């Protein structure tokens, strides 16, 4: 776990004057929720989602006037006993309505519970209603069933389509709770291949049977699945299951923090990630003057997202885990060939509790193939605090034009506790050497204080024992940090200057 110094600077000029960048809201992304009753619930969800449904013909009365073109409600004929007049009335008052969802899990006994034959017999009336209202029609939503009239979703659909024909609906709806991209992709690929219809994934989250799912596991699978769903041309729309529910106990899918009564609502950690993830627009290229949130990548591998505490980050979320082999690809439009400085805003936990991160910068093509190394792998230190941010700079030479740039983990070890909040470019390629090393600063215990010596003016310091426990921290005054009551032994000291440069020192008491 040897460490090589890298440049850690104060907030760069690019962050001070750069244009803030935030991605557009995804047309695809939606939520399912049968218990929306408050405007405040809608307000926190609609910031990053475009549609919702409740499994009902119309929204609940308390929110029936809230849907609009920016956050549309999609009515559903849950089974054959729907109220066509209610749907007509809603569509008349909400001309933004464009779609009608068909039967919900007809191959489940405790859902619509319809044989393919029964569903086919009731389908012409649903078709007629959709045609009358000028709505695109989404076929019945199916999944694997433990008890239905036809357990296998492919068999149920084959029999249904054999009776009504492929032209009886515009899209196919499915549900998937596998928790992984592979199982989801397999199901989507198969249905799309069979019928050539784009997919509405109207229920999904990580809920594989009776397995325990932690909030962290739910977010990890969400991040990978949303990226796949946004980028797949086979997927027309998707909806998370569901907006309200437990956020701490399995399956921990809730997007809104549970709260009784009226009043403002807030997103759970799961909700912050789902609502604020990128729309993965492959046609959008950032300018070199933007402050780009780290979550605005267009391609990634084995990373996790979570809340950001960086005031310089335009997004409320950031990369919170960069696993071994992880990477994130970003699109930039470079105005002129030349030397540039790439600045990453980072925080997180490093040694002695985690391996310090190693990061390299690469040029990649649109298929993700690495074309060239822009900056070699370097290991750098972290502040051992997820809410203290520093600038890490890389000097790179770029060609002019639109291109993809990859930020990639290069370390042989996992885990690294790095967080990445945002990134910027400066068009000069200069990197100011503000690294602290042991030639510039040293420290030793002097009674109940930790005394600093050297050329660097230390502003704050944190002291850890060899188990990684924080035992002292605070401002350094008169080159000394109060460190009372510490037993004799070896300690690790993280020292930071007022400009944001940092180093880790080992000291014996």
Where are these regions (language model features)?
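N-terminal carbohydrate-binding/catalytic regions of secreted carbohydrate-active enzymes
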Residues: 27-100
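Aromatic- and acid-rich polysaccharide-binding/catalytic face
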Residues: 54, 75, 104, 154-209, ...
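Aromatic-rich peripheral "rim/lid" segments of glycoside hydrolase catalytic domains that contact
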Residues: 70-74, 232, 236, 241-291, ...
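Active-site groove signature of glycoside hydrolases
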Residues: 94-116, 137-147, 167-176, 201-204, ...
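Active-site clefts of carbohydrate-active enzymes
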Residues: 139, 145-149, 194-222, 241-259
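Extracytoplasmic
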Residues: 281-429, 468
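Residue-level detector of functionally pivotal "anchor" positions at catalytic/ligand-binding pockets or at interdomain
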Residues: 426-449, 454-455, 459
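C-terminal tail/sorting-segment detector
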Residues: 434, 488-509
């Amino acid at each position: 776990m040897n460490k090589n110094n890298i440049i850690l600077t104060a907030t760069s000029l690019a962050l001070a004057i750069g244009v803030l960048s935030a991605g557009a809201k995804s047309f695809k992304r939606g939520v399912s929720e049968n218990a929306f009753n408050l405007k405040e619930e809608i307000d926190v969800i609609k910031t990053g989602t475009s549609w919702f449904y409740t499994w009902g013909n119309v929204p609940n009365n308390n929110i029936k006037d809230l849907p609009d073109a920016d956050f549309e409600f999609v009515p559903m004929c849950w089974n054959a006993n729907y109220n066509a007049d209610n749907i007509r009335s809603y569509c008349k008052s909400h001309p933004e309505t464009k779609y009608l969802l068909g039967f919900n899990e007809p191959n489940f006994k405790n859902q619509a519970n319809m044989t393919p034959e029964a569903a086919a017999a009731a389908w012409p009336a649903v078709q007629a209603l959709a045609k009358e209202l000028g709505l695109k029609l989404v076929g019945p939503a199916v999944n694997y069933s433990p008890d239905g009239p036809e357990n296998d979703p492919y068999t149920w659909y084959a029999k249904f389509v054999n009776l009504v024909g492929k032209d009886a609906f515009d899209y196919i709806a499915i549900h998937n709770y596998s928790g992984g991209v592979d199982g989801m992709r397999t199901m989507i690929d198969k249905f799309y291949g069979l019928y050539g219809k784009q997919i509405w994934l109207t229920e999904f989250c990580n809920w594989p049977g009776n397995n325990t799912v932690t909030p962290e596991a739910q977010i990890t699978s969400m991040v990978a699945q949303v990226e796949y769903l946004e980028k797949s041309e086979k997927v027309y729309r998707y909806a998370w299951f569901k907006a309200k529910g437990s956020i701490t106990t399995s399956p921990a899918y809730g997007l809104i923090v549970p709260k009784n009564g009226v009043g403002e609502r807030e997103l759970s950690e799961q909700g912050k990630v789902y609502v604020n993830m990128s729309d993965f627009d492959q046609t959008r290229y950032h300018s070199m003057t933007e402050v780009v949130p780290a979550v605005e990548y267009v391609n990634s591998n084995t990373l996790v997202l979570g809340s950001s505490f960086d005031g310089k980050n335009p997004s409320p979320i950031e990369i919170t885990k960069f696993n071994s082999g992880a990477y994130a690809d970003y699109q930039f439009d470079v105005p002129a060939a030349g030397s540039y400085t790439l600045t990453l805003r980072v925080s997180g936990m490093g040694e002695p509790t985690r391996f310090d991160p190693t990061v390299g910068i690469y040029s990649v093509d649109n298929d993700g193939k690495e074309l060239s190394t822009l900056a070699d792998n370097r290991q750098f230190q972290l502040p051992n605090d997820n809410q203290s941010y520093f600038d890490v700079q890389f000097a790179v030479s770029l060609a002019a034009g639109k291109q993809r740039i990859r930020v990639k983990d290069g370390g042989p070890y996992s885990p690294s506790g790095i967080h990445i909040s945002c990134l910027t470019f400066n068009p000069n390629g200069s990197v100011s050497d503000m690294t602290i090393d042991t030639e510039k600063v040293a420290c030793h215990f002097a009674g109940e204080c930790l005394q600093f010596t050297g050329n660097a003016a230390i502003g704050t310091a944190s002291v850890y024992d060899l188990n990684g426990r924080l035992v002292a921290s605070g401002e350094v005054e008169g080159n000394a940090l109060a460190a009372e009551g510490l037993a004799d032994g070896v300690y690790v000291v993280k020292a930071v200057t007022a400009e944001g440069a940092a180093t880790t020192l080992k000291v014996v008491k």
